[in-house]
Amino acid sequence: MKKMNKLVRGCMVLVSAAMLASCSDSFLEQDPLSFYNPGNTYTTESGLRSAMAMCDLGLKEMLMDGNGNVLPIASLYFMTDIGLYAKTDAGFFMDDFANKITPTSGMKGGGDENAMSRFWDRGWTSIKFANTVLSYVDQVQSLDEKVRNEYKGRAYFHRAYGYYHQALLFGDIPLVTKIIEVPKQNYKSTSKEAIFQMLVHDLEFAVQNVPAQKDMPYMGTVNQEACMQLLIKCYLVTGEYKKAEDMATDLINNHGLKLMDAPFGSLVTGNSTTWPVERNVVWDLHRGENVSIAENKETIMPILNFHSQSWINYPLMRAMCVHWSNSVIM
């Protein structure tokens, strides 16, 4: 047994010595199989599509927080006289602006106060990818002018959507219209008025070059109707009310859109033992099966959310419907 232990120890010493002797400086030299070069990635149409996909994802993440409680899209109403955060069991929510609200109230994210931070951090991410498309699209040689302008129009939409919310929520902010290639710390704010003038200019280009939904083979990405709707909102901000009215009239009358006034689509009965449903148009409008179908004339541009494709929890009822069983509301 003693001889065996000595033999094992001897073998371990020999192996360790061999490993130390064979490890040289060349062993530590990097040998990467590839390098990430934006100039190579985004000068192909597949690279542009990947950046545009990140813009589409950013639009969804900007509106849908997914933390199980509050939603960014609902937070836009919490800061107005339209509504109040309905999750009354949270213990803290924006129901007393005079005493509770500060410039950064709820901005830490993930809490129950609001989800305004999503419009800030995810807005900048969407702006970054939109600027990436705009910076490289002219270098993609395989694109004809029509397709090139479609990419530009969709990128303008995503950049405008990010800045629309940021400028209205936070006021004067830095205006970034190109890729930041080196660290930058000397940002300066641009007036909200100047930002919206740029958004109007960009969206007018988008309306002229992004195809209508009827001319697109798929749903869930930016269409002409969405560009028109965002341009209408920007016209209202800049005080160009006649242009907003004319654009809205065009959108309604010439793009097959209208308010639904009768039941349509698939009948989803729900759980009759919990709440028996008498079919009506409002019920049908809020069934997931009916959101993106051709019969639904209220949908301008759907945001697709599937378990197989970057699913994000969407707790709309948690944020918008009062928790009646809690004593906080009494």
Please report, for each region that a protein language model flagged, where it lies by residue.
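Bacterial N-terminal signal peptides that target proteins for export
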Residues: K2-C11
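An aromatic- and glycine-enriched ligand-binding surface/loop that stacks and positions planar moieties
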Residues: S24-F92, E225, L231, Y235-M330
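Short linear capping/connector segments at secondary-structure termini
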Residues: L33-N37, T177-K184
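Conserved, well-structured interaction surfaces
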Residues: E45-N67, K87-F170, N186, T190-A194, ...
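Outer-membrane beta-barrel proteins
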Residues: D121, Q213-Q224, V237, N326
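Short coil/turn linking the two alpha-helices of tandem helical-hairpin repeats
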Residues: A167-L168, P174, V237-E240
